[in-house]
Amino acid sequence: MILGNGKTLPKHIRLAHIFATQNSSAKKDNPLGPEGMVTKDGFIISKEEWAFVQAYVTTGTGLPINDDEMRRHVGLPSRIQIPDDFNQLYKVYNEDKHLCSWWNGFLFPLVLKTANDISAYGFKCAGKGATKGYYEVMQDDVENISDNGYDKVAQEKAHKDLQARCKILIKEADQYKAAADDVSKHLNTFLKGGQDSDGNDVIGVEAVQVQLAQVKDNLDGLYGDKSPRHEELLKKVDDLKKELEAAIKAENELEKKVKMSFALGPLLGFVVYEILELTAVKSIHKKVEALQAELDTANDELDRDVKILGMMNSIDTDIDNMLEQGEQALVVFRKIAGIWSVISLNIGNLRETSLKEIEEENDDDALYIELGDAAGQWKEIAEEAQSFVLNAYTP
């Protein structure tokens, strides 16, 4: 690359110059560092965003897909019947449950592996504990090239060692790029549908959202708080309460008459008592019990509708939020794949840099300093990525 002043940039910093001129707002332009792996909010894979996704998935894996599971999920006793109309809800929940189970068993481990790849690469470049990182060893190679101008054999060896280390780093960056592409592909399937990792057709969260919206409209029309049935149930409950109150009052009055029957004398009182007990009292008792049972059933149905539809509305909201977070996650993983490509290209530029160019560049220790600065950046991102992996399941 020829600059306006006629100077030629060495190959290993050409891409950095392009970054600097095209994006003057970039905080770091070291071509050997993890540029882009850190945003203004921290590590590129945000723990807060993924915690939300995990919460959604945890809910999804526990969705009820039959009457028995629904009763346990919302706390309905076995005496309460669940109409067949709700079977359409189970079908949608089953699709979502499969997606969420696939996420937990396959996709989320890939997300963690991507973060672990970043951490492993960072520690490989920067070192960890007593283990020297590649960049520090490459600094030694650069020094050996610079200090052995009189010994071409030593220079050539140092240059070949530097190229060999670059080759290893390039190979790993390319592997991690392919892995990030794989996550993006499967994440896209999770959101938009396709085939999962086992070759099964899945409809995706977007289609689940559409299906649930249709079911929601249908069930709201049949059982929602604005439905004719709901209004009828409310009126029925109100009428039954009034009727039950009247029956209980009549029952109490009759009980008083039974007790007062003995005022007629022992013999006549006993006869009147038996007649009342066998006829009126039993009749009113049965009426009270029947009214109470009917009222309980009506209240149970109202409770059932409120609980099941309430859960459905909550899931609908969760899906809306999940799609928003999922689209952001897809952008992140596509960006990570792109970053790995740039890292591979940058280290490739260094690998292709001639021995003479390194000698010239190292007159002001630029490459040596560049490697040291990049090592510090990689160590920082490696620790953040490691923290994400270690705390991924912590709410």
UniProtKB/Swiss-Prot annotation:
CDD domains: ClyA_Cry6Aa-like (cd22656)
GO biological process, alphabetically ordered: sporulation resulting in formation of a cellular spore
SUPFAM superfamilies reported for this sequence: Bacterial hemolysins
Keywords recorded for this protein, A-Z: Sporulation, Toxin, Virulence
UniProt keyword annotation of ATP-binding present: no
Highest rank taxon of the organism: Bacteria
One GO MF term: toxin activity
NCBIfam families per UniProt: alph_xenorhab_A (NF033928)
Family from the record: Belongs to the cry6A endotoxin family.
Function field: Endotoxin with nematicidal activity.
Protein name (database record): Pesticidal crystal protein Cry6Ba
Species, as recorded: Bacillus thuringiensis
Lineage of producing organism: Bacteria, Bacillati, Bacillota, Bacilli, Bacillales
Encoding gene per record: cry6Ba
